[in-house]
Amino acid sequence: MKQTIRVQIREPGVILAGEIVYGQRRAWGNLSYRPLKLSLMRPRPSSGAAQNVPLIVWLCGGAFTEVDRDIWLPEMVWFAKKGYAIAGVDYSTTYRTRFPESAEDVKLAIRFLKAHAAEYGIDGNRIVLMGESAGGYITALCGLTGKNREFDTGGFENYTSEVQAVIPWYPLVRLSGMKIEPDRVTLPHDITAYADITGYVTRDAPPFLILHGSGDSLVPLSQGELLYDSLQKAGAYADMIVLEGAEHADTAFVQPEVKALILDFIEKKLP
């Protein structure tokens, strides 16, 4: 059977560049180097058209001991179809490094992306930082220190790591107050060095949207509430969405209605 059909273009195609090196870390007794990479997913541009799309920088979790920048990217296609670029970012994990090097890596990635904004077709003035669990901790820390240049090292320092909105999912906030079951997750040996996020909260923090599940048995809801309350007390803008009954890294967080709430927040808060 032969058919001729007319297709109406309702959404963009999506493309992925999966091996972009944004920096490097010393390795093997400081005698070698290992690359820091990011994966960049974008709406496919029309022929000859210049892009200037907003960017979501995404940080995977992994108890600060492991990370996979691509593991959540299939769920991020939804945002790419809405006209956003998404950068899944590698950061150092603590069998190789110590606090605050993971935050330094992420802030370097943000500055790198700003420096290459025209090349990649992204808008360096419209960046959302979003991450889950340990990545949510780094998300909050980097979001709160974008203006004061803390942890800015490694290159591209003529750009800031400031972002316009911050969306941590079930973030760790004050690690000293948490009870972790060692049979469920192994935290880094230097966990006591990880700063209390609330110590960085100021009135001029970028807008925050915090997501947390009421049934989270790994990072309790009280951690997300602690960050929300600290932002509210400081006079910064903060929203919080509690997913009833949702566990840690629950599939509930990637349902269309939750993504729609995230998108609504982003579109209201980006300049």
What does each model-identified segment do?
Residues 210-212, 216:
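Short beta-strand/loop motif that positions the catalytic acidic residue
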Residues 69-88:
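Short amphipathic alpha-helix adjacent to the substrate-entry channel of hydrolases
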Residues 59-61, 113, 212:
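The conserved beta1-alpha1 loop
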Residues 7-12, 25, 163-200, 206:
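Mobile cap/lid helix-loop segments that gate and shape the active-site cleft of serine hydrolases
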Residues 108-180:
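Primarily recognizes the serine-hydrolase "nucleophile elbow" in alpha/beta-hydrolase
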Residues 1-50:
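N-terminal cap/lid segment of alpha/beta-hydrolase-fold proteins
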Residues 221, 225-271:
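C-terminal catalytic histidine-bearing segment of alpha/beta-hydrolase fold enzymes
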Residues 50-62:
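Short beta-strand element of the alpha/beta-hydrolase
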